[in-house]
Amino acid sequence: MALYAIGDLHLCLGAPKPMDVFGGNWVGYMDKLKEGLSVIGSEDTTVLLGDLSWALDLASAREDFAWINQIPGRKIILKGNHDYWWSTASKFYKFCEENGFSDKWILNNNHYVYNGWAICGTRGWFFEEERGSDHDEKVFKRELIRLETSLKSAGDLPKIVFLHYPPLYKGYRCEEILELLKCYEVRQCFYGHLHGASHGLALEGQWDGVEYRLVAADKLNFQPYQVLF
């Protein structure tokens, strides 16, 4: 039994889109993902950190979720900035039921438990007051509420946070998110979103008592990162 994490699968079976614009290592990435994800077993849990599919709606995402359905075990899903198919949790679960897709769970205003650890998280957002718009500020504040709701729901359990957007990288710190992680004594924080040359902006390792790690698929060479045994 193990807990894995990987973000940014960028599946495009129902909405073909070239991915090599993000770098040459995306060539043949579907085959790389299939091989990399083969380490996951039926007793494992995998957190998918957003940007799962390029589809614009759930119907168009059916082939991509059929592919995800082949990943064994429990799949916990959070939203990325390119998940335009994203709908309400009830519509997503109905879609999964109608298509025979099993063991997929939305991480949004809630938490899940793995071996005594709380899996918390939300999409996150970039916002800098001097450059942000009113829309960005509203989305950012909403994401802060969702993250704190997720953390609160876990009570006294030790917490691991999963985000799509990085809460810090070279030249940027999202102080509000970092303060929440500190306040709720989060041990580890995993994030995605950064690709190609942007990997060089990622900050990984210990910062203020929290361990950060980038788990975008191309950063991991399309192999899931093992968070816990």
Regions found by a protein language model. Name each.
Residues 17, 24, 31-35, 113, ...:
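Binuclear metal-dependent phosphoesterase catalytic core
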Residues 70, 94-108, 177-195:
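Structural recognition of alpha->loop->beta junctions
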Residues 16-17, 49-69, 84-100, 130, ...:
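Metal-dependent catalytic neighborhoods of phosphoester/phosphodiester hydrolases
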Residues 9-14, 83-173:
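Conserved catalytic scaffold of divalent metal-dependent phosphoesterases
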Residues 1-70, 84, 142, 146-157:
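N-terminal active-site segment of His-dependent metallophosphoesterases
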Residues 32-45, 134-201:
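His/acidic metal-ligating clusters that form di-metal
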Residues 5-7, 46-51, 75-81, 105-108, ...:
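Active-site neighborhood of phospho(di)ester-bond hydrolases with catalytic His/Asp-centered motifs
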Residues 41, 70-72, 101, 114, ...:
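Short, well-ordered coil/turn elements that cap or connect secondary structure elements
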